A protein has these predicted regions:
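Catalytic-core signature of thiol
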Residues: 171-443, 448-481, 513, 518-527
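Short, surface-exposed tryptophan/glycine-enriched loops
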Residues: 293-298, 489-503
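Primary recognition of N-terminal secretory signal peptides and signal-anchoring hydrophobic helices
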Residues: 17-180
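Short beta-strand segments enriched for Tyr within beta-sheet-rich domains
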Residues: 445, 503-509
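Positively charged n-region of N-terminal signal peptides that target proteins for export
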Residues: 1-6
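Hydrophobic helical h-region of N-terminal Sec-dependent signal peptides
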Residues: 9-14, 18
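Short proline/glycine- and polar residue-rich coil/turn motifs
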Residues: 480-487, 499
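Short, surface-exposed beta-strand/loop patches at domain edges
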Residues: 510-570
Length: 570
């Protein structure tokens, strides 16, 4: 193993301190001999941690390098790796929740870790342990000891000082992530039950209920379905209904959400000048009827927006498919979904006898409706795993940030993912050109994966002039990776790109979506609701193999779903 000169010097110092009696002078100039290990640590540990923190620490989980910024992870003076708690949810497949701004709870299957900010006492399944390094807050970020979480969740944990790398390998890949039953109501992660009244706005209520749940328990917000259903870019009324793609378009375009108090529901009035109070940067679309993925999403992110065919027309109406006594619903006919709800939990052992029909096995999702508290169990009911529609369309809002994350958004697809474009194959290149409004840093780009396991490469082109600027020699690779689920994703630049006022630049994406023939998401005039699509605000190009390019506005009458996020530079 090759060590740096620093580590050789440190080793010599440590050897001298540990094996020789060290002479130190007291205030009377007499010699004092000591082998105090704490004295050695006071000298040695800061030297090691400073050297480690000079470089970025690499984190590899199950063989894959994790996208972690340098400020998200560091070594403290106890030689423990501390990591932002926000990086653990996705990378260690666990539930992570912050209560009262000072208590963190990590959960995975049958393991529960409880930490308190600035306390060296922790609890593992209610058993008390002592920590070498306590969780703490720095620059509004909470850091926790990585090794504790990894080992308690049964990962092998290895630190390679020469490579500045941590490797964590899951020993329990065959074990489930989630327990047999889970209810967001039990952990203060369900939002307030609302009432959509007589309007066809269940899609907006479900979307915002899911977002409110995702923000809990850290933040308790009440968001406005009125604004989402009236101030989006679609040509439809509150009586026309909607779907999750409309909600995603409104949210990822930063048209909202806004507070309910600023746009009260049901009065037919909505202020067009309100601005978003949160920025939704990621929307995952979960695989059809994949109940384990749905459960994991509820566990990790909060409520999951889903759809079913509801034969009921009001809280007091009757249906052969609904057992009012047990709040239990199951539909097994051929009707398509007509109503959106939010999955807030599940119970694998919920009795099949509670439903109005003979079912093969137990099990149900716990769902929150938007018909007020007079429906079901204070607005909540059970939907059998055997319902034909539940779990087909599933959306989770997995990255919701404060509005200071970026200063500007450049976009031309306010209606979002309306259709798809491609060349009859799984891969495609597409690019959008933009002109900077002022001196800015290009910090991230956002686009859709239209199917599961989509590989992507993202390129930056400076000083864009025309199609020729998209040539191979002008592209700079920014990042590449894979999206497990379909959905909208924001990809950050490791190093932002500076642009001057009036400078033109472009973002190019290469994607490969298995089993797709049209992998690029586009906005176009598909039906009456998208008749107001504006083709004059975008400059997009598409290519089969990244060599010959066509304008999508001119040849396909559409806009590419590709956004750019920037920060202002003083």
């Amino acid at each position: 193993m090759k060590y740096s000169i620093k580590y050789i010097v440190f080793t010599i110092i440590l050897f001298g301190l540990l094996n020789l009696n060290t002479n130190v002078f007291n205030k009377n100039a007499s010699v004092v001999k000591t082998n105090d290990i704490s004295y050695v640590k006071d000298i040695w540990n800061p030297l090691i941690s400073d050297s480690v923190n000079e470089k970025k620490i690499i984190l590899v989980v199950d063989g894959l390098e994790v996208d972690v910024d340098k400020q998200d992870m560091f070594m403290d003076e106890n030689l423990n790796i501390m990591i932002s708690y926000k990086k653990l949810k996705q990378n260690f497949d666990c539930a992570v929740n912050l209560y009262d701004n000072d208590r963190l709870v990590f959960e995975k299957y049958n393991t529960k870790i409880e930490l308190e900010i600035n306390s060296n006492t922790a609890y593992i399944n209610n058993a008390e342990i002592e920590l070498d390094s306590e969780p703490f807050i720095c620059d509004s970020e909470i850091y926790v000891p990585l090794e504790l979480v990894a080992r308690e969740f049964d990962y092998d944990y290895q630190w390679d000082i020469a490579a500045n790398k941590i490797s964590a390998l899951n020993n329990s890949l065959d074990n489930p992530i989630v327990p047999y039953s889970y209810d967001l109501r039990d952990v203060a992660r369900n939002s307030k039950v609302k009432n959509q009244g007589s309007f066809g706005t269940c899609w907006a209520f479900a979307s915002l209920t899911a977002i409110e749940s995702s923000l809990l328990p850290e933040e308790e917000l009440e968001l406005a379905p009125d604004h989402m259903s009236l101030q989006n870019s679609f040509s439809s009324s509150q009586n026309d209904g909607g779907e999750y793609t409309m909600a995603a378009a409104y949210l990822t375009s930063w048209q909202g959400p806004v507070y309910e108090k600023d746009d009260p529901y049901g009065d037919g009035v909505s202020n067009p000048n309100l601005t978003a109070v949160k920025h939704v940067q990621e929307v995952q679309i979960l695989p059809e009827k994949n109940y384990e993925k749905i459960k994991e999403a509820v566990y990790k992110y909060g409520g999951v927006q889903s759809s079913l065919y509801l034969s009921l027309t009001s809280p007091t109406s009757k249906s052969v498919y609904y057992n009012r006594k047990n709040y239990a619903y199951c539909y097994k006919g051929e009707e398509r979904p007509n109503h959106d709800i939010v999955i807030i939990g599940w119970d694998d052992n919920y009795p099949k006898e509670n439903f109005n029909m003979v079912l093969e096995q137990n099990g149900a999702f716990i769902c929150q409706n938007s018909w007020g508290e007079s429906f079901g169990d204070d607005g909540v009911f059970y939907v059998s795993y055997y319902d034909v529609n539940i779990g087909i369309h599933n959306v989770v809002y997995s990255l919701i940030e404060d509005t200071n994350n970026y200063d500007n958004i450049y976009q031309s697809d306010l209606c979002g993912w309306v259709g798809q474009l491609g060349y009859g194959r799984e891969s495609v290149y597409f690019a959008n050109a933009y002109t900077a409004n002022t001196k800015e840093e290009v910090s991230a780009a956002g686009f859709y994966a239209t199917g599961e396991n989509t590989d992507y490469e993202m390129y930056y082109i400076s000083n864009f002039e025309n199609i020729e600027s998209l040539g191979v020699n002008n592209r700079k690779l920014i990042k590449k990776g894979k999206f497990e689920n379909a959905g909208f994703y924001t990809v950050k630049f490791d190093t932002p790109k500076l642009v001057a006022e009036g400078e033109k630049f472009a973002i190019m994406i290469y994607i490969n979506t298995p089993n797709s023939v049209h992998p690029a998401a586009i906005e176009y005039h598909a039906e009456e609701s998208t008749k107001n699509v504006d083709l004059s605000d975008g400059e997009g190009y598409i290519s089969n193999r990244g060599k010959k390019w066509d304008s999508v506005e001119e040849t396909q009458s559409c806009n590419l779903c590709l956004k750019v996020y920037t920060k202002n530079v003083p």
